[in-house]
Design a protein with these regions (language model features):
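Bacterial Sec-dependent N-terminal signal peptides
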Residues: 1-25
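Residue-level detector of secondary-structure boundary/capping sites
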Residues: 5, 137, 183-187, 229, ...
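Alpha-helical hydrophobic/aromatic positions enriched in membrane-embedded helices and signal peptides
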Residues: 9, 124, 181, 223-224, ...
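A periodicity- and composition-biased signal for non-globular, repetitive helical segments
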Residues: 11-13, 155, 556, 640
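Beta-propeller folds
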Residues: 21-421, 430-434, 444, 474, ...
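Serine-hydrolase catalytic core recognition
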Residues: 206-207, 264, 409, 416, ...
Length: 737
């Protein structure tokens, strides 16, 4: 997933409408890239993107659960290499964020045989099942151990035997999943004889105990292995188990396992792994080769930063090898911008394929047959996103794909008379011949088309974006650049109310996030909507604004993004306050006497900061699931951006909103779910105690047993939306004056 996109989505429900509009589920391309498969009406079908012809590959009548006497409902599926068998994942349950546990079934298309995997194992306990490359076995995880099941005989081999809740084989603990995107924790060897896997030793990690008080007469303790900032992380190591002998060889990776992270690992040869290692502060990244025969390791490439090193990709699987494994493609910010590099296998030679003062967003496809790399970027407007291509062997001939016109690197221009400014998304076939293209802008609802590459021409002109795009004339959004008092230029948007009259004054609702995990200023349809408001916020006469502060993950240089290092709660809050102050000066129709700020998660923290520290700027704040004290959050995230509290504890204290709670002057509504495994409910209790200490009156809502998204249970969203709307309307009255 894109560097830029994932950080937008990490605001999760705060941009739910935008996410749904912009993102189709991941396309399941066939191996040759000339078609794709999907689930439709319970059947697994194959679709030809050129003719749009649909062919049923697996009929729902063939996948009947004999015990329930009804068809399986595939959550996901995977074919073997020759498309004669398919793994079906169903009856799933959530593990923290995602439904990664459930039942797996194997359907043999030629034999017309359906088999449930994991006989004798607990129902709904299998995770990450996948075919071995030779197609003879299926590997999966159950109850923290790794298994291999022979397809022909059905024999199940338990490859690890020491797995417990605290000693995890083949998957990850809470922190690795949340902060590194690591879930699937094992990889088949190319010959199918071995499995490389992560083992996470969380035995020394203290549990955070959540309390379920709603599901029975007696409360139930829910332990979460959660290493808080300043605490050592889980000890992680990589092993290789022989499927036939069950012998395990552990990789001898230098550095203490609790002072380094191993977030990426893949096979790089028959008896070799490639691994990415980050040190505890995440300021040093090393790429290693591990010999799976003797466990020895060799470092072949490294980079460092005085702030932090981002992971190469948000998707933890795969490695971009080219030239028969002699080189690989890598993304790095080592020159101050996010660029694409070609690196030799031994790490001794590197070629920077993209150059100049701009960031690339994400690699969309490596079409090695045509020496092309397709990637997204936006050199001239950080609120937008476009597709580019480059020739791997001739990177100076960098062309932008835009409305079928190739524009050379020397002709980069932010203005296209016949183009469509906004946010473009692409899913490109493995062979580089087809692309599923989505587009929207602030005033263009989402549209989609299928393209033929490299020509960049629609497969169906009648269904092309040019034929179907329309302008929403009801939208009144203005993108502005704000130059603050300390000469920092910030991007912002203003969403004006319906029937706007510039001679009148309107209340202002400031939506904030502010931390390195997400940005909010996007030229995309729906990104300006307030999903939590019950009713039509524009019809009710509110102006809505948002600002991307320094430190937000936008395409404006590594220096921009990393200026927040050790300064969360400082740089970002200052930028927001100064930017908002400047907006009030620039736009006289904004009513300074009716200003409200709100946000969720990191945005909740920013809301508290602004309300506590700038009491004359904001009259009202609504903070949801905020980190009140940075020392309460997990170590991977907080240490990446703030360092170690053992070395600079004052930065954590000064950056925590609870430090300033005594300054509350305006109206505060604070909301939190008691079952929040991410930002723990103890943040709410700490904040409440501090406000009580100083006799600060406020409104408070705790949602019993709800998680960070406050979405579980009947009526929850309706109640939350009503609460939010009523409070806003009461303390920041709507309408023009």
């Amino acid at each position: 997933m894109a560097f830029f996109r994932i950080r937008i989505l990490l605001i999760f429900i705060c941009v739910a409408q935008f996410a749904i509009a912009q993102n189709r589920g991941k396309i399941n391309w066939t191996a040759d890239g000339n078609a794709y498969t999907k689930v439709k009406d319970g059947n697994i079908i194959q679709v030809d993107p050129v003719t749009e012809e649909e062919t049923i590959v697996v009929s729902k009548t063939k996948i009947i659960d004999p015990a329930a006497n009804k068809a399986l409902l595939p959550q996901s599926y995977e074919f073997n290499s020759n498309y004669t068998r398919v793994l079906i994942f169903t009856n799933t349950v959530k593990v923290w964020r995602y439904n990664t546990m459930g039942d797996y079934w194997l359907y043999d298309i030629l034999a017309d045989k359906l088999t449930r995997l994991g006989k004798g194992l607990a129902p709904q306990s299998l995770m990450f099942a996948k075919f071995s490359p030779d197609g003879k076995s299926i590997g999966y995880v159950s109850e923290h151990n790794i298994f291999a099941e022979d397809i022909s005989s059905g024999e199940i081999t338990k490859l690890t035997k020491d797995g417990t809740r605290k000693l995890i084989n083949g998957t990850f603990d809470w922190a690795y999943e949340e902060e590194f995107g690591c879930r699937d924790g094992f990889r088949w060897s190319p010959d199918g004889n071995m499995i490389a896997f992560w083992q996470v030793d969380a035995t020394k990690i203290r549990d955070y105990y959540m309390l379920n008080t709603t599901d029975s007469n007696y409360s139930k303790i829910i332990p979460v292995e959660y290493p808080k900032v300043g605490e050592d992380p889980s000890a992680v190591k990589i092993g290789v188990v022989n499927v036939n002998t069950k012998r395990i060889k552990w990789m001898n990776i230098e550095g203490g396992p609790q002072q380094n992270y191993l977030p990426r690992m893949e096979w790089s040869g028959k008896n070799e792994l490639v691994v990415q290692q980050l040190n505890r502060k995440q300021q040093e990244s090393k790429l290693l080769y591990c010999n799976t025969n003797d466990g020895s390791t060799t470092t072949f490439w490294a980079e460092s930063s005085s702030a932090w090193v981002d992971l190469n990709a948000d998707d933890p699987s795969g490695w971009n090898w080219i030239n028969n494994g002699k080189e690989f493609i890598w993304i790095s910010e080592k020159d101050g911008w996010r660029h694409i590099y070609k690196i030799s296998r031994d790490g001794q030679t590197e070629v920077k394929l993209t150059t100049g003062p701009y960031d690339i967003d994400d690699i969309k496809c490596i079409d090695e047959a045509n020496n092309l790399i397709y990637f997204t970027a936006s050199p001239y407007n950080a609120t937008q996103l476009y597709l580019y291509k480059l020739n791997i062997e001739k990177p100076s001939l960098l062309n932008k794909i835009f409305n079928g016109k190739n524009i050379t690197k020397e002709e980069f221009d932010p203005v296209y008379a016949n183009g469509r400014d906004g946010t473009h998304g692409y899913q490109i076939s493995p062979n580089g011949k087809f692309a599923y293209h989505t587009y929207s802008s602030h005033n263009t609802p989402p549209v989609k088309e299928w393209l033929r590459l490299p020509q960049n021409t629609p497969l169906n002109e009648a269904k092309s974006i040019e034929a179907t795009a329309r302008t929403d004339s009801t939208v009144d959004v203005e993108f502005v650049k704000i130059k603050t008092a300390d000469s920092i230029t910030l991007n912002a948007w203003i969403n004006r109310p319906k029937n706007f009259d510039s001679t009148k004054k309107y209340p202002v609702v400031f939506y904030v996030y502010g931390e390195p995990a997400a940005s909010t200023v996007r030229d995309a349809y729906g990104a300006q909507n307030n999903f939590l408001y019950k009713g039509d916020i524009r019809a009710d006469g509110y102006i809505q604004v948002t600002i991307d502060n320094r430190g937000s993950p936008v395409l404006k240089s590594a220096a921009w993004r990393k200026s927040i290092y050790r300064k969360i709660g400082d740089v970002n809050i200052s930028d927001m306050a100064k930017g908002f102050t400047k907006l009030l000066e620039m736009k006289p129709y904004m009513d300074k006497e009716r200003t409200a700020v709100w946000g969720w998660s990191g945005g909740g923290s920013s809301t508290l900061h602004l309300l506590f520290r700038y009491p004359d700027l904001f009259q009202t704040g609504i903070a949801i699931a905020a980190v009140a004290n940075q020392l309460f959050y997990d170590n991977i995230y907080q240490e990446r951006y703030m360092g170690l509290p053992q070395e600079n504890r004052e930065d954590f204290v000064n950056g925590s909103p609870v430090t300033y709670a005594k300054n509350l002057k305006g109206n505060l509504l604070y909301i939190h779910g008691t079952g929040d495994d991410n930002v723990h409910f103890s943040n709410a209790e700490l904040l409440v105690n501090e406000l009580i200490k100083y006799n600060k009156q406020f409104q408070y809502m705790a949602y019993p047993n709800r998680s960070h998204s406050i979405s579980e249970g009947p009526g929850t969203f309706e109640h939350l939306s009503t609460l939010y709307t009523n409070y806003l309307r009461l303390h920041c009255p709507p309408g023009a004056k």
